[in-house]
């Protein structure tokens, strides 16, 4: 129907006849000559409807309004002197229209397509209009390139794309499952997969050797800016591999994805042990675009005359005292800013925020009186303090201190404008603990219970580490993976450590244990969150900007009004009866 997309055309096409299709982006009547900005998925081009060129086209144009669908035929000509629009790819040219068709009319739109101030709920209610925004289209064009690049890269490395089931069995993977009632087997339910984890392991047991899938996953969890109830991941599994092999594959396809998106990245990525990430940055996904690394000063505070700090410093296993040095911070921060810093950390469990300022005549601050001159000199040397610096201290329980100081580090970086928005800092975080303790004292798998432990015979669960790895970009976890357990006895032992008895093992994971009993190969893999990846590449503010039809923070689709009540007939067929007074 069309001869070109709008932005295929340029000054080299002057004099050429074209046929274009699209929507009215804007409409202007200048003294009898009508100018229409025609928008298609590629961008905008200006149509000129002059009655001297075509009375019929001009008359039709006079009836056009925003978001009407047009088909225009005409000739390319250069714009007049001083009329070039450098903001448009087609800003040097315009189309003199000889024939115009209104293919379809539009109701008055509830908002202007390019208006960035529109309430997000309104945008999501009319998502089909919102997606006409060229900026959003660019996000999905980039997403498509990324998917194609991932497929090509993995195929070139010998990986086979295999689809795994969407209707499957509920298995504990950390979040709540979405359940689907069975009509045929009433009273029984399928679960939508939180990931293809067990199926891809079974494919390795089947001898497929190298698998991948761009997989849809479902998790019924509370939403945040970077979470959705359904999301997409680049899922990879391989046999007869070690951690370094999986990392090499992941770096290869990530490099190819970024190249397809117009960005060059350097490999190999740097690596950091989990314990170092936590102790030095207060996060298992540290943002390395800036420094502000923690300094451990608990041994110096152990010698202080302050009873509170001295008591904290006695237990170096359970407690931490960390410092963050801000070069020239004493010359930058106002008294009000220093108060705001303390208010910030208190929101995350801090009892306060101690600090020392470096003046021309030495270290100053309420803390100084609790230290000897020798200890202050040691503190100054440890923190590499210079005149004009300020150093902040966090002290208390290990988990609390690392958390609030990690958050404070990012808060400081934003206050100081230390973060380069164009930088791409990749990092592998490796050697994760196998287990983590819950608030009730029980233990759960930090990644998942199918991860290979390094020292399974260790009696202290907190000392057992795993062959697990996360890839981080600019402080955001892109994805993670592990070498899997491929021996039945080790898998059963891990289940027992998680208080999953033999009956539960058989009920929930019997098929996996069976597969591990028939010569399962060593295997491992990784999953990269595609939505999150594209959000970072495009600079989008929310993951909703890179998903065509996303849910809200309340897990609702405002456009289709999902979820919605099922009919009484459908409920009867499924054998389901709701309790009364359910809202």
Curated annotation (Swiss-Prot):
This protein's GO cellular component annotations are: cytoplasm
Q: According to the UniProt record, what class of enzyme is this?
A: ligase
- Write the Enzyme Commission number(s) for this entry: 6.1.1.23
Residues annotated as region Aspartate?
A: 197-200
Positions that bind L-aspartate: 173, 219, 447, 484
Under Gene Ontology molecular function, one entry of this record is: aspartate-tRNA ligase activity
Alphabetized, the UniProt keywords read: Aminoacyl-tRNA synthetase, ATP-binding, Cytoplasm, Ligase, Nucleotide-binding, Protein biosynthesis
Mention one GO biological process in which this protein takes part, according to its record: aspartyl-tRNA aminoacylation
Residue positions annotated to bind ATP are: 219-221, 228, 477, 529-532
The UniProt site entry described as Important for tRNA non-discrimination is assigned to 30, 82
Task: Tell me, in one coarse class, where this protein mainly resides.
Answer: cytoplasm
Pfam families named among the record's database cross-references: GAD (PF02938), tRNA-synt_2 (PF00152), tRNA_anti-codon (PF01336)
What this protein catalyses is: tRNA(Asx) + L-aspartate + ATP = L-aspartyl-tRNA(Asx) + AMP + diphosphate
Entry keyword Transcription: no
Indicate where this protein resides in the cell: Cytoplasm
Q: What does this protein do?
A: Aspartyl-tRNA synthetase with relaxed tRNA specificity since it is able to aspartylate not only its cognate tRNA(Asp) but also tRNA(Asn). Reaction proceeds in two steps: L-aspartate is first activated by ATP to form Asp-AMP and then transferred to the acceptor end of tRNA(Asp/Asn).
Listed under subunit, the entry gives: Homodimer.
Q: Which HAMAP family match?
A: Asp_tRNA_synth_type1
Stated family = Belongs to the class-II aminoacyl-tRNA synthetase family. Type 1 subfamily.
Q: What is the name of this protein? A: Aspartate--tRNA(Asp/Asn) ligase
Native organism:
Campylobacter jejuni subsp. jejuni serotype O:6 (strain 81116 / NCTC 11828)
């Amino acid at each position: 129907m069309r001869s070109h997309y709008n932005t295929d055309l340029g000054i080299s096409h002057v004099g050429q006849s074209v046929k274009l299709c699209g929507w009215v982006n804007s409409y202007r009547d200048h003294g009898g000559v009508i100018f229409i900005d025609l928008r298609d998925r590629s961008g905008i081009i200006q149509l000129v409807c002059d009655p001297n060129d075509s009375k019929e086209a001009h008359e039709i144009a006079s009836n056009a309004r925003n978001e009407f669908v047009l088909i225009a035929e005409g000739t390319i000509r250069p714009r007049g002197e001083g009329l070039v629009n450098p903001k448009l790819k087609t800003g040097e040219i315009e189309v003199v229209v000889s024939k115009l068709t209104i293919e379809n009319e539009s109701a008055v739109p509830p908002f202007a397509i390019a208006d960035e101030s529109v309430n997000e709920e309104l945008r999501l209610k009319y998502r089909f209009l919102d997606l006409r925004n060229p900026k959003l289209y660019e996000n999905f064009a980039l997403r498509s390139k990324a998917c194609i690049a991932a497929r090509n890269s993995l195929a070139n490395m010998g990986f086979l794309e295999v689809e795994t089931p969407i209707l499957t069995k509920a298995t504990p993977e950390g979040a709540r499952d979405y359940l689907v009632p069975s009509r045929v087997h009433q009273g029984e339910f399928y679960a939508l997969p939180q990931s293809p984890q067990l199926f891809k392991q079974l494919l390795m047991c089947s001898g497929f050797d190298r698998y991948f899938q761009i997989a849809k996953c479902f998790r019924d969890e509370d939403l945040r800016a970077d979470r959705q109830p359904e999301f997409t991941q680049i899922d990879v599994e391989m046999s007869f591999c070690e951690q370094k092999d999986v990392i090499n594959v992941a770096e290869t396809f990530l490099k190819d994805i970024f190249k397809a998106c117009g960005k060059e990245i350097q490999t190999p990525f740097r690596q950091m042990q989990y314990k170092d990430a936590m102790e030095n940055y207060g996060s298992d996904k540290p943002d390395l675009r800036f420094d502000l690394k923690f300094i451990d000063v608990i041994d110096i505070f152990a010698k202080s005359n302050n009873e509170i700090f001295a008591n904290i410093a006695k237990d170096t296993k359970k407690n931490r005292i960390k410092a963050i040095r801000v070069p020239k911070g004493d010359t930058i921060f106002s008294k009000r800013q220093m108060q705001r810093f303390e208010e910030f950390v208190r929101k995350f469990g801090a009892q306060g925020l101690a600090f020392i300022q470096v003046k021309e005549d030495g270290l100053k601050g309420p803390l100084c009186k609790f230290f000897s001159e020798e200890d202050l000199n040691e503190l100054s040397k440890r923190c590499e303090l210079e005149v004009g610096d300020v150093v902040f201290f966090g002290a208390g329980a290990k988990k609390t201190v690392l958390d609030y100081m990690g958050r404070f580090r990012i808060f400081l970086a934003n206050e100081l404008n230390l973060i380069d928005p164009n930088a791409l800092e990749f990092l592998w975080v490796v050697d994760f603990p196998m287990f983590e303790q819950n608030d009730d004292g029980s233990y759960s798998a930090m990644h998942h219970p199918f991860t290979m432990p390094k020292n399974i015979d260790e009696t202290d669960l907190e000392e057992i580490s795993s062959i697990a790895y996360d890839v981080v970009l600019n402080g955001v976890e892109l994805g993670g993976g592990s070498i899997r357990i491929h021996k039945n006895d080790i898998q059963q032992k891990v289940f027992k450590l998680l208080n999953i008895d033999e009956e539960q093992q058989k009920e929930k994971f019997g098929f996996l244990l069976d597969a591990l009993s028939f010569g399962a190969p060593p295997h491992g893999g990784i999953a990269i969150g595609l939505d999150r990846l594209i959000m970072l590449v495009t600079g989008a503010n929310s993951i909703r900007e890179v998903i065509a039809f996303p849910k809200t923070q309340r897990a609702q689709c405002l456009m289709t009004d999902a979820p919605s009540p099922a009919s009484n007939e459908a409920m009867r067929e499924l054998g389901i009866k709701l309790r009364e007074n359910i809202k």
